[in-house]
Amino acid sequence: MKVPQLRKKSEIKSCHNVTWEDNYSWIHQKDILEVLKDKNKLNPEVREYLEQENSFAEFHLKDTKNLQKKLFNEIKGRIKLDDESLPYIDHSYEYWTKTTAKGNYSIKLRKKINTNLVEEIWNGDKEKEKLNVEYFGVGDLEVSHNDKYLAYSLDTKGSEYYTIFIRDIITKEIITKKITDTSGSITFSIDDKYIFYSKLDENHRARKIFRHKIGNFSDEDELIFEEKSEAFTVSIGLSSDEKYYFISTSDHNTSEQYYFKVNEEKPTPKLVIKRERGILYSINSWDKKFYNHTNKNAEDFKIDISNSLENQDWQPFVAAKDEVLIGGCIFLNNWIIRSETSNALDKLFVRNISQNIEEELVFTDEAVSVPNISLRQKDKNTDEIYVGYSSPKTPSRVYQYNLSNKSKKLVKEQEIPSGHNPDDYIVERVDYKSHDGRIVPLTITRHKKTKIDGSANLLLYGYGSYGNSMSPGFSSTRLSLIDRNIIWATAHIRGGMEKGMRWWKEGKLTNKKNTFEDYIYAAKYLIDNNYSSKGKLIGMGGSAGGLLMGAVVNKVPN
């Protein structure tokens, strides 16, 4: 079968005093966002070429049909299809979700506390069937504070333009029928008379915040905030103490926030701190104080505290640390919980407010793991939370943990129906030197029977973009490779934030080559230390990681 050929049409382009020939710029459609909404608007010649590429790939993979089926069944066999989440107590109800073997979408359930009557308030498969659509993506599912309304957003075309609906949970009546072209995010007002949402512009950017009165037509919605810069996007959220709404506007490097009180009849957002190029900040309020998570004079962030936003008197709460990324806070009446990331490992810390004592939460002796935390209930007057962790060899485990007496109880463990023994696997964290001497973390997972003599095949995964960190958590799909003596290695290369903001900055823009070199030196380390050998390495990277793959195979094809 011949390799598909795309028509060439020469066009000379220039930028920054560099001129080049581009044979394929004709592919770009100016109305590409319209194509996302309606796939029939795709250039027919491009569609035909893509179909040829699909046929070409299928032709060359035809001998692997049985293997594909076997792998599919293996991976499916590790997924518990009939499953339920842990409950979350919100006012007078417990809410949770479940999945079933027969369905493709989740079901949201609730029951009144101290009763056994379970209500189904959302069923994705039934909703998709009612709409009779091919594509069905759920953006947000939010229940009102009074437990009366369910607001949800749907994308039925794969365009990531979401339409919002609001339904009366008891009567099933659609109260608000359609708010189109939104980002999908929904926030209820405290009195449950309104929702706040962001509208997408023609360039798919959220730059406007609207207030919608439940039951009204969307053309009556009130614009309460508009971002003038095309480079920034906006969002809105409720503070932890439920006394303020904060509107956040930001690009990747700079942010700004506005606030208004929840009881304002006509919301008038007030500026918190004027934007300053390169400065990120995020304000939250709790117990009559305001907390500012910011990188101002703190490359890897810090947390400051103030008694007022009108007369700001910021004082240190959590100091900055070199190459330690300081995360935000979760607030309870007696406790403040926060996170840190350093050397590609996450940590959780809990502070006793009355004693002003902080300590790390540790739930496993595994050297490489990913901790997580979630609240059991909306009421903050509690000492109990959910704390969990996973690792490259250990599926997720969640404990109900009492912060006061430090007792814990295992309440949910990710089940692998086909069976899984963590002791069959070995996880290593090693460091290697890159081209400029910087030390890069590398997480390696292998079966205990796999030999370290250069004979094993090895998949080296990399991303290194947008400040996204590759946390070393559990993945059941990887086991199909690892069980076949293929070593899985994740290089925590620059461009992510595994070692703080500087790690990101050293792998972006004019420093992007560091991302590529870090990956190449990871491959060299793995070969030099007999994890694999030349000709046995598999490179993997998707999305922005695709740029990485293109760069490294051209730079060092051997």
Task: Give, region by region, the residue ranges found by the protein language model.
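Beta-propeller folds
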Residues: 1-384, 388-396, 400-405, 421, ...
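Cap/lid segment of the alpha/beta-hydrolase catalytic domain
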Residues: 126-141, 153-159, 173, 364, ...
